[in-house]
C-alpha cells in the first residue's frame, strides 16, 4: 500500500497515512484517461449551433421568373441554397455532444489519475481543513504553508461552504466534494489537496 505524509493545515507533518492500493496505487492507464477527458469535454459543449434551412429562411415562396423564354437559368425560389440569403444545406442543428463511457472504464480513469498524483508526489493529505470564517487571506496562508504555489484541487469529504468561499478568489484553486471528484479536474490541477475524511470517502466509492 502506498504511504504518504499526513499534514495538518499549518503545514507540519503528523505521521503517515496508508492509501488503498486499488485506488491510489495502480498502474496508470493513459489511454483510458484520454478517453475519459474526451467524454467530459464533450459533455461540456453547449451544442446550441443552428442555421436555417431553405424551409426556414424568410421569402422565396414565388418562382422568381418564368421557366422559359428569359434566357436566364431556371429558378424555383430565391431561397434555394445557391442564392445569396438562401437556406443552408446540411448545416449544424442543436444537438447534445454528451456520451457515456462504461462505468468500469470511468472508474479506471479516476483511479489512474489519482495514482499518477501519488507517483509524481503531487498529493497532499490533510488531517482536516477547517476555517472559522470566510477568509481568503487565511486560506492563501494555509496553501503557502503547504508549499502550494500552482493550480490546486481541494477535495473535502462533504460540502464546506466556508472553504469554498475562502478559496473562490484564489486563481487556479478549485474546491470539490469527494463524491464530485473527476478526471478533468484532477488532470487540470498540478496539486491535489485532499482531507483524510475525503480519502476514506473516495476509497469507499472506488475500491
Swiss-Prot record:
Keywords, comma-separated and alphabetical: Ribonucleoprotein, Ribosomal protein, RNA-binding, rRNA-binding
Any one annotated GO CC term: ribonucleoprotein complex
SUPFAM superfamilies reported in the protein's UniProt record: Ribosomal protein L4
Complex and partners: Part of the 50S ribosomal subunit.
Bias type Basic residues, positions: 60-71
Pfam families for the chain: Ribosomal_L4 (PF00573)
GO terms, biological process: translation
GO-annotated molecular function: rRNA binding; structural constituent of ribosome
Disulfide pairings: none
Organism: Bacillus pumilus (strain SAFR-032)
Designated name of the protein: Large ribosomal subunit protein uL4
HAMAP family attached to this UniProt entry: Ribosomal_uL4_B
Stretches the record annotates as Disordered: 48-78
The protein's role, per its UniProt record: One of the primary rRNA binding proteins, this protein initially binds near the 5'-end of the 23S rRNA. It is important during the early stages of 50S assembly. It makes multiple contacts with different domains of the 23S rRNA in the assembled 50S subunit and ribosome. Forms part of the polypeptide exit tunnel.
Protein family according to the UniProt entry: Belongs to the universal ribosomal protein uL4 family.
Amino acid at each position: 500500500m502506498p504511504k504518504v505524509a499526513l499534514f495538518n493545515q499549518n503545514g507540519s507533518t503528523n505521521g503517515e497515512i496508508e492509501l488503498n492500493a486499488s485506488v491510489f496505487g495502480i498502474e496508470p492507464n493513459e489511454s483510458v484517461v484520454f478517453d475519459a477527458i474526451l467524454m467530459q469535454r464533450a459533455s461540456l459543449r453547449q451544442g446550441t449551433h443552428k442555421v436555417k434551412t431553405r424551409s426556414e429562411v424568410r421569402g422565396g415562396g414565388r418562382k422568381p421568373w418564368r421557366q422559359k423564354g428569359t434566357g436566364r437559368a431556371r429558378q424555383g425560389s430565391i431561397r434555394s441554397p445557391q442564392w445569396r440569403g438562401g437556406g443552408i444545406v446540411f448545416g449544424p442543428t442543436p444537438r447534445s455532444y454528451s456520451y457515456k463511457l462504461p462505468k468500469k472504464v470511468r472508474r479506471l480513469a479516476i483511479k489512474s489519475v489519482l495514482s499518477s498524483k501519488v507517483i509524481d508526489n503531487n498529493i497532499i493529505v490533510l488531517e482536516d481543513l477547517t476555517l472559522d470564517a470566510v477568509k481568503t487571506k487565511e486560506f492563501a496562508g494555509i496553501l503557502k504553508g503547504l508549499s502550494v504555489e500552482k493550480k490546486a484541487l481541494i477535495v473535502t469529504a462533504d460540502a464546506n461552504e466556508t472553504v469554498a468561499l475562502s478559496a473562490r478568489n484564489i486563481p487556479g484553486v478549485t474546491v470539490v466534494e469527494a463524491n464530485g471528484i473527476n478526471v478533468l479536474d484532477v488532470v487540470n490541477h498540478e496539486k491535489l489537496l485532499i482531507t483524510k475524511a475525503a480519502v476514506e470517502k473516495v476509497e469507499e466509492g472506488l475500491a
